[in-house]
Amino acid sequence: MQKIVLFLDIDGVINVPEVYSSEFISCYQRFDLYGSPVPLARQFLQAVDRSESIKPFWMSKGWRKHAIVWNQWAQTRPWRVAYPISFVQMREVMAKYPGIFLDEVEDGKTLAAIWHSGNVDRVVWIEDGFPESAIFWAKLDNRVTLISTLHECDRTQIGINAENIDRIFAALNLKLD
């Protein structure tokens, strides 16, 4: 069975407040947390969680360690949080890839993705747009598939939706129930 690492951003991917209504997601330290999930968010998270071949990671600058509230909302197991990584880990990645110009601040997500990718068969990263470093890394490493949830012509089509769900499911070898 082919092992796939999935890096999943939240804002602009499964949470799109500019387009969808706000709803209660979970509580954290007695505070209510709200999000605006895309219509396919819960089904998608559950399908990923059921897969034995996918090792999912949250990759969110905004939610960071609180990303796991989305697992609670979707009634799935908590996933690991990939971002941020330590400066020691960042420097190890930068030493391993001297051909890629990597900045510790600007390219933090790319550094985290490289760090957590290890020796898996395939890497799928779903994000609302990618930095140049991620694009360059994907060109160097044929295991990497980058899927942007930005729609260049229609800004209301941000997030996981009918325009990109087939590509996402094909990359992950998934099917909705």
Please identify what each model-predicted range represents.
Residues 2-99:
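Alpha-helical substrate-recognition element adjacent to the catalytic core
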Residues 71-177:
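C-terminal cap/substrate-recognition subdomain and adjoining C-terminal extension
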Residues 1-3, 176-177:
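Short intrinsically disordered terminal tails
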